[in-house]
């Protein structure tokens, strides 16, 4: 399987509010930047969409090292998702999982790949994390303008 390194980030102005996500994919000497956003969303949804969009962009099975500064994503995928799935996508106190649509999409995106998850401290000088943050802010800016116009 092809090795890929992914760095992701999400951003939101207000929570909820306009938001953006960004991802950098590196494979060999090739690098690809992805970004997007929504007019009305949350930071956690943007963090999830960054990881989902990056994984869905891969066209064949890969071994992935995915770096995120989101404890929500890291804990969700590393600890919580297994119980959610076993409990029919309900939390331990029987409430529906927040952002279940995105967690299910992330779960599906993982099936083709071997993914190792890494947490990095945000805004701490990690070059790729800073670049992913800028892409997320670019996506946010585009959708902040849309929410003001539309």
From Swiss-Prot:
InterPro entries per UniProt: RNase_H, RNaseH-like_sf, RNaseH_domain, RNaseH_sf, RNaseHI
Cofactor: Mg(2+)
Disulfide bonds listed in the record: none
CDD domains: RNase_HI_prokaryote_like (cd09278)
Pfam families per record: RNase_H (PF00075)
One BP term from GO: DNA replication, removal of RNA primer
Compartment(s) of residence: Cytoplasm
Top-level taxon of the source organism: Bacteria
One CC-aspect GO term: cytoplasm
Gene3D superfamilies named in the record: Ribonuclease H-like superfamily/Ribonuclease H (3.30.420.10)
Positions contributing to Mg(2+) 1 binding: 9, 47, 69
Record: residues binding Mg(2+) 2: 9, 133
Domain RNase H type-1: residue ranges: 1-141
Catalytic reactions of this protein: Endonucleolytic cleavage to 5'-phosphomonoester
Alphabetically ordered keywords of this record: Cytoplasm, Endonuclease, Hydrolase, Magnesium, Metal-binding, Nuclease
Note on how the cofactor is bound: Binds 1 Mg(2+) ion per subunit. May bind a second metal ion at a regulatory site, or after substrate binding.
GO molecular function: magnesium ion binding; nucleic acid binding; RNA-DNA hybrid ribonuclease activity
Residue ranges that the Swiss-Prot or TrEMBL entry lists as coiled coil: none
UniProt-listed Enzyme Commission number(s): 3.1.26.4
Complex and partners: Monomer.
Role played: Endonuclease that specifically degrades the RNA of RNA-DNA hybrids.
Xref: NCBIfam families: PRK00203.1
Family, as annotated: Belongs to the RNase H family.
Protein's name in the database: Ribonuclease H
Organism whose genome encodes this protein: Rhodopseudomonas palustris (strain BisB5)
Taxonomic lineage of the native organism: Bacteria, Pseudomonadati, Pseudomonadota, Alphaproteobacteria, Hyphomicrobiales
């Amino acid at each position: 399987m092809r090795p890929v390194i992914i760095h992701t980030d999400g951003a939101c102005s207000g929570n909820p509010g306009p938001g953006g996500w960004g991802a950098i994919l590196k494979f060999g000497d090739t690098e690809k930047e992805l970004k997007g956003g929504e007019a009305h969303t949350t930071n956690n949804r943007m963090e999830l969409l960054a990881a989902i969009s990056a994984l869905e962009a891969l066209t064949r099975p890969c071994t992935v090292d995915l770096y995120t500064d989101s404890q929500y994503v890291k804990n969700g995928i590393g600890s919580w998702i297994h119980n959610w799935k076993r409990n029919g996508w309900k939390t331990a106190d029987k409430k529906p999982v927040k952002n279940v649509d995105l967690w299910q999409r992330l779960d599906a995106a993982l099936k083709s790949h071997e993914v190792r998850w890494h947490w990095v401290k945000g805004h701490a000088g990690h070059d790729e994390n800073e670049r992913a943050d800028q892409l997320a802010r670019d996506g946010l800016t585009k959708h902040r303008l849309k929410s003001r116009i539309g």
